[in-house]
Amino acid sequence: MLETKEFKFTSTPEKGEVSALLVRPDTATHLLVLGHGASSNMRTPMLGAIAEGLAGHNIATFRYNFPYSEKGGGRNSQATVTETIRSAVQAARGVCPDLPVFAGGHSFSGRMTSTAQSESPI
């Protein structure tokens, strides 16, 4: 069975809440926190296909939006983006405390997740 739940979490104190989407198979062994590309959001069909494919391999996903993709406007500063990534990982750990957590993303969020990790462990 596949569990799908929507959540909100605080991205940064200044930017407020953003949306997240958990896709968790009953047999999940790991959780991937998965960010989107610069010009899309967590509901892009590609990320949906990735989440579905990973679920078939017992990997849960926690997709999330950045504040700019949630509320409109221009892209957020690097500091806001990396803080949002850290907040997403923390929120994912709270939702699935029983699973080892990994973080990554498509294009922009993949680079920014690497940047956040290089600044200080996520």
Model-inferred region functions:
Residues F7-P100, T115:
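Serine-hydrolase catalytic machinery in alpha/beta-hydrolase-like enzymes
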Residues T115-I122:
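Conserved hydrolase catalytic core segment
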